[in-house]
């Protein structure tokens, strides 16, 4: 009896150990990847000069141009500490990785946007002041250059070969913790995110936090298959949804920046929307798919080729268009000046149309990037919101002569109380046209606190007036 108990115990122990070893054997070992790549992943810190007003200042100081004799004269009669606003350094952190042994580094556009100085720190703690060779907002890719040689370069893979469920690994500097390693799996491929139409993101559940941006995403072969770019979160922290830029797209952008200082993208010239189940039925489709053409822009490649409103684009250069979000990346990476084969559904019949692809009119790239005031969002504390400029092309497409776009609403605040929404385009304040960020600043500074003011905003549904009451904060 005692022997049987011992036998049963030994059998159970053997099964437990066997299962443990089999589970352990089935898990990937990331140590080799980390060891081989650690010298090629860098920490990036930026410094930005921002105005700093004196908290003891009792009265507003006129904003004279730098070096103005009026400004110097005015300051002579002010008490100490009430002169022109001083400036302080604002710092932020990110990651990047070396793509050539002579010092070229890849990172995100948003990591270095607006930077006055960029410092790159290697794994051995060596630091370099980096030059921003170029930065492309549309793809969120930036290229840096440091004065160094014989640097270790990472290997590049092919993100097209990735499979959903495959293990991936990220290395970066979340919250400044250098060379932190996290792992997860590929959750989906070809994701489209708002305002990032030209990037088919790789979605993963790898833990990504502030500071990881710009760092590499590896496959199990130790090859870079993406650049960690952003997360989806309702709290600001990691919630299991991370997005990376495919490495092929990033390297294509980087090469264009290095060679020409700008990025060229294909342009079709249509406004599209998703095909719903009800629309699919009306078009004689067995299931909803494709991109429905809602508008064909005048003199565009699509117009010249004969594309029409109501056409459903179901294929582009041999690749299926399952969702409307699939089309912009396909068009964007097509070759300018060459014919593209566009498969459409028209009058319940499928047909092929050749379209000569033109270059996207709006260039979001800035070679030898230098921040401009007009590029940066402007905030109105009294109105409780921040706005950004519209490009000429955006104004043209929206058929607007003026306007600035709302990108952030303070909660609570005047804008929230007035019912203003992110994405609203403000074209008029207090019966004055808003043509630029400068107009927005000038008009809002002259508003009376507590007095209701009319704003004209443009929404997809059309223009609407809203009343807002500036708050004295």
Per-region residue spans from a language model:
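C-terminal recognition in membrane/secretory proteostasis and scaffolding
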Residues: 2, 8, 21, 26, ...
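Bacterial N-terminal signal peptides
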Residues: 10-20
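Glycine-biased strand-turn-strand hairpin within the trypsin-fold
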Residues: 27-32, 37-105, 113-115, 126-127, ...
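Active-site loop architecture of trypsin-fold serine endopeptidases
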Residues: 29-30, 47-57, 89, 115-118, ...
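Active-site substrate-binding loop(s) of clan PA
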Residues: 31-33, 121, 131-133, 150-177, ...
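Gly/Ser-rich catalytic serine loop of serine hydrolases
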Residues: 92-95, 154-156, 203-218, 298-302, ...
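Short, acidic, Ser/Thr-enriched surface-loop or helix-capping motifs
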Residues: 93, 99-100, 122, 127, ...
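Short, conserved beta-turn/loop elements at beta-strand boundaries and strand-helix junctions
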Residues: 101, 135-139, 190-194, 275-277, ...
């Amino acid at each position: 009896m005692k022997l049987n108990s011992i036998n049963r115990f030994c059998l159970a122990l053997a099964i437990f150990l066997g299962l443990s070893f089999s589970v352990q054997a089935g898990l990937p070992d990331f140590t080799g990847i980390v060891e081989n790549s650690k010298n090629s992943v860098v920490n990036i810190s930026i410094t930005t000069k921002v105005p700093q007003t004196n908290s003891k200042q009792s009265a507003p100081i006129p904003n004279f141009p730098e070096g103005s004799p009026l400004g110097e004269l005015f300051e002579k009669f002010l008490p100490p500490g009430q002169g022109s606003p001083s400036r302080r350094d604002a710092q932020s952190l990110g990651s990047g990785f070396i793509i050539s042994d002579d010092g070229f580094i890849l990172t995100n556009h948003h990591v270095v946007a607006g930077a006055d100085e960029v410092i790159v720190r290697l794994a051995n703690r060596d630091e370099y002041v980096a030059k921003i060779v170029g930065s492309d907002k549309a793809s969120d890719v930036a290229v840096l250059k440091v004065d160094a040689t014989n640097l270790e370069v990472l290997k590049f893979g092919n993100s097209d070969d990735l499979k959903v469920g495959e293990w991936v690994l990220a290395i970066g500097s979340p919250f400044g913790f250098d060379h932190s390693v996290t792992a997860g799996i590929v959750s989906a491929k070809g994701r489209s995110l708002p305002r990032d139409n030209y990037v088919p993101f790789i979605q993963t559940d790898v833990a990504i936090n502030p500071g990881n941006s710009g760092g590499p995403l590896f496959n199990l072969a130790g090859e870079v298959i993406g650049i960690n770019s952003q997360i989806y979160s309702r709290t600001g922290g990691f919630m299991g949804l991370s997005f990376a830029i495919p490495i092929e797209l990033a390297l294509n952008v980087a090469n264009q920046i290095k060679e020409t200082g700008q990025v060229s993208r294909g342009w079709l010239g249509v406004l599209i929307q998703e095909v719903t189940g009800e629309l699919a039925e009306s078009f004689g489709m067995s299931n909803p798919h494709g991109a429905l053409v809602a508008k064909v822009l005048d003199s565009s490649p699509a117009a010249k080729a004969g594309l029409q409103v109501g056409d459903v684009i179901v294929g582009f250069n041999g690749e299926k268009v399952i969702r409307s979000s699939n089309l912009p990346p396909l068009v964007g990476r097509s070759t300018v000046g060459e014919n593209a084969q566009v498969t459409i559904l028209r009058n319940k019949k499928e047909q092929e149309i050749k379209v000569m692809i033109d270059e996207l009119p709006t260039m979001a790239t800035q070679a030898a990037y230098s921040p401009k005031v007009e590029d940066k969002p402007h905030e109105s504390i009294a109105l409780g919101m921040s706005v950004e400029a519209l490009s000429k092309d955006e104004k043209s497409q929206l058929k607007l002569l003026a306007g600035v776009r709302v990108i952030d609403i303070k909660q609570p605040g005047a804008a929230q109380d007035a019912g203003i929404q992110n994405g609203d385009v403000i074209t008029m304040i207090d019966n004055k046209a808003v043509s630029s960020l400068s107009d927005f600043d000038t008009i809002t500074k002259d508003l009376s606190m507590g007095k209701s003011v009319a704003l004209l905003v443009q929404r997809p549904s059309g223009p609407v007036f809203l009343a807002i009451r500036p708050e004295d904060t």
